Every structure is written in structure tokens, then in C-alpha cells.
Amino acid sequence: MSDEHHSGLLYGLEQRIPPLPAFFSALQHVLAGLVGIITPPLIIGATLGLGDWLPYLISMSLLASGIGTFLQSNRVWGIGAGMICMQGTSFAFLGVTVAGGMWVKAQGGGPQDMMAMLFGVNFVAALVPVIVSRFIEPLKKIFTPIITGSVIALIGISLIKVSVINWCGGEKAEDFASMNNIALGAGTLGVIVLLSCAKNRWLRLSSVVVGIAVGCIAAGLSGQFHLHSLGDTLFRLPTLFPLGFQFNSAIFLPVALVSLVCILEAVGDLTANSLISQQSVDDRAFRNRLKGGILADGVSCMVAAMLCAFPNTTFAQNNGVIQMTGVASRYVGRYIGVILILLGLFPPVGELLRQIPAPVLGGATMVMFGCVVAAGIRIITQTPLSRRDVLIVGLAFGAGLGVESVPAFLSHFPPMVGDLFGSAATSGGLVAIALNLILPQEQAATKSLRSQDDRAES
């Protein structure tokens, strides 16, 4: 048997996979990330009064995500991590995007002026990850396992909250947390877990798809799933900068700062992806993957801005799918990219998937997001933790979970602070970086003495 099979992988990173299992695996990645891709444009569009443009924004978000995912998996000219790194619309930019749109509106601008300004600023801000990607070697002392592991674990915990809300029916559901919703999500989750533990590779490969299908059937039989109109537009052809290009430095600065913070999340996602894919996370090949992955993040954001979509980032969800299906083959990323591109070009298909009941998606994503948390913990515990490491991890989790649990903690700070520290991953990650730079390193002799004491006790 191959090393991949001993490690629990059905297909390793560089192992080619037949088309049918590749498609099933890719479809599960798409289902896991679909809601995350289309939700930010829905929120931004509703807040800024862009209702007439929402179908176009959603289609272009899917298209940009597909192009970015394709770039990440192929690693052409050094662009991309060469792994299954699904790109999707970033939630981190919601605050600064809405603030920028409101500023344009206050100056008398309409919806088209707002979007021309926002996408122009986003295009220039995408240069931040492009530039930072060239300096990964000097920054490797910052992106240590305890920092990247803490960030990825906090991302997973934040995603679990989203999963539970969907499981209950969605934030605005009239029957929120009803027994029907709980049972529907639990049934979907149960099917996925059972199939993921099966020895048959086909059952494991299709666990998420089958689980969601069973959940949809159950929802239909119980009257909780009703198909609505799929829209009148069968095909949507994109154009570059359809509304023009505008720029303002006052709007650019906060967007650039959020772009810088998002790099920290991307490093965590890429590290977890490498670990789950049975790749080293402490060699030159890994640093090249980081360099290419962050560069692809920047290029993907540029593509998104040109297409009239909001900034992209590397999604953590797909790490959970890799863990569950055992498929780490980067060639699956091509299929994911093509599926997302088709969803963007053919809106009815994406609309059909969008109508999957929220409890079904909540149950399906629960186990995936839990795997993301586990991947973060695994990164943290790669090496024995010193007292200093425990302090950094503890305070990072405290800061991240504190802000996540009580958002009002930042309510009296300037909006810029709220944008930078508003999520568990960014607040915890920035605290971890600051402590790692400030706290003195433990002396080697102290570490050695402690190791001897541990061995003596054992």
C-alpha cells in the first residue's frame, strides 16, 4: 500500500484521480463553500442598496472564486500553492466595504459610483498580498506553528458558529431551532459521518453529496424544501470593470490594512492544508507553497475586482473536506474551479444549489468545520509547548473567543479597530504575533532541564 493509504489519504497531493471521483470530491468542496461565497455580496448589496445588481454580483463572485481556485491548484509561473485551496469571497472586508460605499453615497454618488470606487480600491489593495508574497522568507519567524495553528483553530470555531445557526434554520428563520430543523441537520450529519467511516472509497468520496441529497429528500418529504424560480437569465457573460475605475486613498487605507490581516488567515489555512495533505510544514517546498498561495490570493482579488466581485481569500472549509474524503489530489482543484466558473456563467445552476435548506447545510458543514479546529490544534502541538508557548496560545484564544462572544467589547473603539479586530481569527492572530515578538524566548538550558525532569517522571 502507498504512504497515502497508510496516512488515511485515498489520493495524495500529486496523485492523479479519475474524472468521476474527482468530480464527486470537487462537488463536495463547492457545496461546503457555496454559502460562504454568496453571503458577503448579499449582505453588502442589501446594506448599500444594490438590490438590482445582486444577481450580477453573486454570479461574478462565483466566477472569480472559480478562477482563483483554478490558479491555486495549478501553480503556473509560481502563482498558486499547488494544493486544493478553494477561493471564496472574504467576510473580513464587509465592514470596510460598507463604510467605503457609505462614504461615496454621502458624497452624492449612486450605486454605480459606489461599485466603481469599491472595485477600483479593491484592485489596488490586492497588490498588498502580491508584494508580501515576495517576502515570505523574512516573515517565517512571525508565522510560527503556534500562531498559524491558533489562527486556523479560531477560524474553525467561528465557522462552527455559522454552521449551528444554519442548522437551526438560519438567522431570520421563523422556526429557528425547531425540532424539525434540528432533526433534519442531525440526520444529514449522521449520514455523512457514517459514510466517511466506510471502508468503501466510493462511499467515502461521496459522503457529503449523499448526505446533502438525503437531507434534501427528507426536507422535501417533511414540507421544508420548496423549489422557487431559478431566474430568467440562463447565461451571463462577464465584462472587465463594467462600471469604470475610481480610487480614493481614504477608502484604500482601511482596505489595505484588512488585506494585510487576511494574509495571516491565509497562512493558517495553507499550513493546515499542507498538514492534512501529508506535506511538510517546515521546509523550502512549504515556504514556496506559502509564497505561491499568498500571491494567488492577491491575483484572485485583482480578478475579482475586474469582474465586479468583492475580495477573495483562501477558504478553510475545504481543509475539512480533504480530511473527510481522504482526497488531497491538487487536480481536484481544477474541477472545483470549473464547477464554480460554470455556476457563475449559468446563474440558474447556482440558484438551485442556493435553495438547499439551511439545516441540511448546517448539519453537513458541522463535521467539516470541526475538522478545521482539529487541524489547528494539530499544528499547535507539532512540538512540545513551552510555558511561553502556552501563554501565547492561551491569550490568543482568549482574545479571539472574547471578541467573538461579546462583539460589543469593541463598540466604543474607532471603526478601524473594529474592522481589524472584529473576528476571532484576526484578533487572536494579531495578539499572538505581538506576544511572540515581545515575550522573551525561554533559555535552552531551561527547556533542556524541563525535558530531563519530564523523562525522569515518566
Regions found by a protein language model. Name each.
Residues 20-33, 177-189, 207, 222, ...:
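Hydrophobic, membrane-embedded alpha-helices of multi-pass small-molecule transporters
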Residues 52-57, 78-93, 141-149, 204-209, ...:
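Short, non-helical or kinked segments that cap or interrupt transmembrane helices
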Residues 1-24, 229-240, 275-292, 438-458:
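Intrinsically disordered, low-complexity non-transmembrane regions of multi-pass membrane transporters
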Residues 16-24, 43-54, 72-81, 104-117, ...:
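Short juxtamembrane and helix-loop transition motifs at transmembrane-helix boundaries
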Residues 6-17, 191-194, 208-259, 411-419, ...:
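Hydrophobic transmembrane alpha-helices of multi-pass solute/ion transporters
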Residues 19, 45-80, 257-330:
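Membrane-embedded helical hairpins/re-entrant loop segments and their flanking transmembrane helices
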Residues 102-228, 335-449:
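Membrane-embedded alpha-helical modules
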Residues 1-84, 95-107:
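N-terminal signal-anchor module of multipass membrane proteins
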